A protein has these predicted regions:
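P-loop NTPase Walker
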Residues: 1-135
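Amphipathic alpha-helical interaction segments
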Residues: 121, 150-151
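Short coil/turn segments at secondary-structure boundaries
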Residues: 137-142
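Accessory nucleic-acid engagement/destabilization modules that flank
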Residues: 154-163
């Protein structure tokens, strides 16, 4: 149902968080994608937290009442063509609070996977899981300020010793 990847670039206050949460819910509800297989990346921890909280809030509201389901259904189907809406109707989705409670449960249970994350934390996780594939011989670690200074000193000494 939902095709391809999506990149959202826009100024503050233009609805990026709402759009990402909508896309996340659509992938789970319409395509059956598990939350740990969806990646939403942003630049700041605050933005990642905002996306996650918006997703939880929308799912919680839909899980709490039929009115919440109706609101969420309108949000999810907004801007779809009539053909796309008919295709979604053909999926026979149970538009009930229980359906959204199940999605909410899945998102909460998958929070440790970090599918909503900052770019740097996502890349660090990739490199940490596959160091050899990225050309590292040893495990990768994040350095604190002192560790960073020590590493720079070692690198400088190594360069000076070669010259």
């Amino acid at each position: 149902m939902i095709e391809g990847n999506l990149l959202i670039r826009a100024s503050a206050g233009t609805g990026k968080t709402f759009s990402l949460a909508t896309r996340f819910i659509r992938l789970m509800l319409f395509d059956g994608v598990e939350p740990e297989r969806i990646v939403a990346l942003t630049f700041s921890r605050a933005a990642a937290q905002e996306i996650y909280e918006a997703l939880l809030k929308r799912l919680w509201k839909a899980a709490a009442s039929a009115e919440g389901v109706a609101t969420e259904r309108r949000n999810l189907l907004k801007n779809f063509s009539e053909d796309k809406k008919r295709a979604i109707d053909a999926l026979k989705i149970a538009w009930t609070p229980a359906t959204f409670a199940d999605l909410l449960r899945k998102v909460v249970n998958a929070q440790h996977t970090g599918s909503i994350a900052t770019l740097d934390s996502f890349i660090l996780r990739l490199v940490g899981n596959f160091p050899l594939e990225f050309g590292f011989q040893n495990a990768v670690e994040v350095l604190d300020t002192k560790g960073e200074m020590d590493a720079l000193d070692r690198a400088k000494r190594a360069v000076l010793e070669r010259t």
